[in-house]
């Protein structure tokens, strides 16, 4: 059985790491552009664009507009401030990207506790442990090969926190054998590693941008390859030449159980939600497990399904499921 975990920023936040875009922007506001010697003129232009960005963000916040709290959406819309100055945008993007990497690098040395490691290991070993008894029986009845769980992870984060957990949790071997006394069976768990769909800190640059051209508000920039190479994440991944897009799409296409943890399911990663939708519709036996953290909706009643219903609707909306597909 192929079990695929997609991990988002909610994972780092649950660890207590200040990795929200709002945390970074507070840091970025106080940084002086530093592109290197001989580029002082570009640095002055960047500073002006930065001031305009924060001014416009403040105005939108006063009007109660929530969309720009997502920095990637904000970047796509802020392109209108540059007119036809594509080089100016590329310099601005470079400065922000480098600053984001510098900021997150401060929190990239995470050492999990033994208790956290054991919990992580159990989560991978028993992917159905979060299901109710009825759902667990349904999973066991599915026509999957349950003698071996192949575990793959796709991280949407830049930090290596999830890899630190897995590296320690599966320190002795990438393959483990487990028995289920309750159900009189056993199986092997094979950990296959982590794919970083947006790049990894200290590994040749990170991807910060949008999913497709329509999310770039500046019409001229939609036709500009220099901008698209940076701002369009699928094109940026292609330029990096790592084949990570193809590898991750293949993992989704072959997954029997897809677990989504800490993901906002926002529009700037729409290609991945579309791929999950395709897998789900192509194979009705595929199971989607979505961990939606909403502490405001917690209830002491285990039959209060409001939180579950809202999470399900959020997933349905993100995948674009319609009618009977739901």
Regions found by a protein language model. Name each.
Residues 42, 46-47, 205-253, 303-312:
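Acidic, metal/cofactor-coordinating or nucleic-acid-engaging core segments within structured domains
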Residues 177-235, 259, 294:
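Long, well-ordered mid-to-C-terminal structural blocks that present hydrophobic/aromatic surfaces
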Residues 16, 209, 319-323:
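Glycine-centered secondary-structure boundary/capping sites
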Residues 12:
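Conserved Rossmann-like nucleotide-cofactor binding loop
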Residues 302-326:
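Acidic, Ser/Thr-rich peripheral helices and adjacent loops at domain boundaries
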Residues 2-6, 15, 19, 23, ...:
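Active-site periphery "cap/insert" segments of enzyme catalytic domains
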């Amino acid at each position: 059985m192929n079990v695929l975990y997609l991990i988002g920023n909610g994972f780092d936040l649950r660890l207590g790491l200040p990795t929200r875009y709002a945390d970074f922007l507070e840091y970025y506001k106080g940084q002086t552009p530093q592109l290197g010697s001989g580029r002082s003129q570009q640095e002055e232009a960047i500073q002006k664009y930065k001031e305009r960005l924060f001014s416009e963000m403040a105005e939108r916040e006063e009007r109660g507009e929530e969309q720009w709290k997502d920095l990637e959406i904000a970047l796509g819309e802020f392109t209108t401030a540059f007119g036809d100055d594509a080089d100016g945008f590329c310099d601005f993007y470079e400065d922000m990207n480098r600053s984001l990497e510098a900021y997150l690098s401060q929190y990239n040395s995470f050492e999990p506790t033994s208790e956290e490691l054991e919990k992580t290991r159990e989560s991978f070993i028993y992917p159905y442990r979060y299901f109710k008894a009825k759902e667990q029986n349904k999973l066991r009845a599915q026509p999957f090969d349950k003698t071996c769980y192949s575990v793959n992870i796709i991280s949407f984060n830049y930090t290596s926190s999830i890899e630190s957990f897995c590296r320690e949790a599966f320190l002795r071997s990438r393959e483990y054998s487990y028995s289920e006394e309750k159900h009189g069976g056993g199986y092997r768990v094979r950990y296959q590693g982590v794919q970083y769909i947006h790049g990894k800190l200290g590994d040749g640059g990170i991807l910060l941008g949008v999913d497709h051209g329509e999310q770039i508000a500046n019409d001229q920039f939609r036709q500009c390859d220099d901008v698209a190479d940076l701002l369009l994440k699928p094109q940026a991944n292609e330029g990096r030449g790592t084949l990570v897009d193809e590898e991750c799409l293949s993992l989704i296409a072959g997954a029997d159980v897809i677990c989504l943890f800490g993901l906002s399911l926002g529009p700037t990663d729409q290609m991945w939600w579309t791929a999950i939708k395709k897998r789900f519709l192509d194979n009705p036996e595929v199971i989607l497990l979505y961990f939606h953290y909403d502490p405001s909706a917690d209830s002491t009643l285990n039959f209060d399904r409001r939180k579950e219903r809202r999470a399900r609707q959020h997933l349905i909306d993100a995948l674009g499921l319609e009618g009977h597909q739901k």
